[in-house]
Amino acid sequence: MPINKSEKPESCDNVKVVVRCRPLNEREKSMCYKQAVSVDEMRGTITVHKTDSSNEPPKTFTFDTVFGPESKQLDVYNLTARPIIDSVLEGYNGTIFAYGQTGTGKTFTMEGVRAVPELRGIIPNSFAHIFGHIAKAEGDTRFLVRVSYLEIYNEEVRDLLGKDQTQRLEVKERPDVGVYIKDLSAYVVNNADDMDRIMTLGHKNRSVGATNMNEHSSRSHAIFTITIECSEKGIDGNMHVRMGKLHLVDLAGSERQAKTGATGQRLKEATKINLSLSTLGNVISALVDGKSTHVPYRNSKLTRLLQDSLGGNSKTMMCANIGPADYNYDETISTLRYANRAKNIKNKARINEDPKDALLRQFQKEIEELKKKLEEGEEISGSDISGSEEDDDEEGEVGEDGEKRKKRRDQAGKKKVSPDKMIEMQAKIDEERKALETKLDMEEEERNKARAELEKREKDLLKAQQEHQSLLEKLSALEKKVIVGGVDLLAKAEEQEKLLEESNMELEERRKRAEQLRRELEEKEQERLDIEEKYTSLQEEAQGKTKKLKKVWTMLMAAKSEMADLQQEHQREIEGLLENIRQLSRELRLQMLIIDNFIPRDYQEMIENYVHWNEDIGEWQLKCVAYTGNNMRKQTPVPDKKEKDPFEVDLSHVYLAYTEESLRQSLMKLERPRTSKGKARPKTGRRKRSAKPETVIDSLLQ
């Protein structure tokens, strides 16, 4: 639908939060764990029971949408992701991310089983949805779709589609673009199959490991970004470009070392994962708390990349995944509280119209220029070329007229020629070559000149043909990147789009029925309350008051239990942070031990004076390191020296006169800067010195 450039609609929405509970897995069944979570999809509530304490009341949380263990992938997509992707196609930014404890089904929700259409997750279903929308668009609408895939592993940003997946990328920020990744590769795609292949390639490069709670545990946060640019005519008659970005985020799960059994590298990964998720929680708390003046986006790479998604220019949906087993009661409650806070975040999303970093307009401009060049080539008349072809026998002329004729020939050779004209010229050259061979009365010199002229014209013609072919190939490549609306691009994804449409229609009918049942239920409850208010005797009134008192008492006990749980959770968070601090302190002490034993104190102070913290890459950098040490030695030119006499003896290291002063200076050079532990900096050739240099000098001089 055309949009007026002067109007930039902005919508202020809360982050939409949904909760999905997976069924008990085989391990939990074999260990005889009990179901502690009950889901009421109609009311949108999740109730958690503490099975080992019958006196404690259950805790109930309410969300926009909830899904039970029997929920289908298509229903999850249509109810949660479809509205976000529709907004992205209109030009808004959108973010969908899954959060939860490790092993709760986040990756299944986001990716699913791509080989089975009914089990595909949000990411592959979005592919079919996007290209289904493009196929239904009007014919004068142009689209450009590109994708990128990155992971955040141990606080390092890596490109999953790049040649070197271990290379660290820098996080940058510009006022006109916002936060972006420098040198992140992006690929233009033409259909859903291309997207699926790229995602499969990136998924193979992702960091995955096994723990006690999950055999295929994600050890990094992954962000799959789809950028959709759309060009169409506005009300003012001009072409306008809208650009929507869709971030599909699969977060690594929070975990406890006691449950996962993580050690070594897995433990380091878990520490970094928990730190970034803790920062994400702090960001959410700061956004919800109206008194907070600072939001710690920069404390983690994850929160910095999701800066727009949380409280910025984006429509965001968070899917909190929980496990049903009583074994994970604390983690389930923590996740639900986390999600409950997130639904209070307000985002201000606006349509990105005519953005500076849009590629679609640039591609369209290049296509127009190439078409213009090709059209100019076909409009050239044959008279411009024939002038140089008719004067072969006048090639020997010199003077002003000859120079002018030569210039005209050069200019004619540079002009673009149509394909038909090229064929005619080639035929004419062949005829002239045959005629030249048959002329016997020509001198050898004239024959050679004429032959050279023919070869030159043939080369010019071949060059023109190559330029024409190159322009055609470039035009074809650019036109393939720009997708025309209304063209069927679904291919294999057509069946998936049909499944999504059918599921969406069925879901709409179920939603209407559920709404009707909810209204009837509310009416019945209201009738029951009215009946309870009408007491026929004092005894009935006493019973009614007792019931109300019990309800209030239950609510009071639930509030007390909630307070106690919050205190316990706060204590657990503190313990977790303290454990992280202890781990970091151990690493810091190890580094300091290495520094104190191998770098002298004087050099340490010098290094500290010349280092600075780089916020973009999150590490310390040494100033002017390019002008030091081996870097300078490599660049220093070696002065030209005459070849040495092979029989000449090098006496530069020999003392020709042993004076007291020269001996003292040479031995004083042995003293070097010492480390903070009192040890001298080791030389390349180690020598044991039992006495100080002054003692050695005095003994030698006696």
From Swiss-Prot:
**Which residues lie in Basic and acidic residues bias regions?**
410-424
Give the binding site residues for ATP. Answer: G100, Q101, T102, G103, T104, G105, K106, T107
Q: Which family does it belong to?
A: Belongs to the TRAFAC class myosin-kinesin ATPase superfamily. Kinesin family. Kinesin II subfamily.
The protein's name in its UniProt record: Kinesin-like protein KIF3A
Q: Which organism is it from?
A: Macaca fascicularis
Q: Where is this region: Disordered?
A: 372-424, 667-702
Q: Could you give a single Gene Ontology term from the biological process aspect?
A: microtubule-based movement
The entry lists its GO molecular-function terms as: ATP binding; microtubule binding; microtubule motor activity
Look up the domain of life of the source.
Answer: Eukaryota
Q: Where is this region: Globular?
A: 600-702
Where mainly located?
cytoplasm
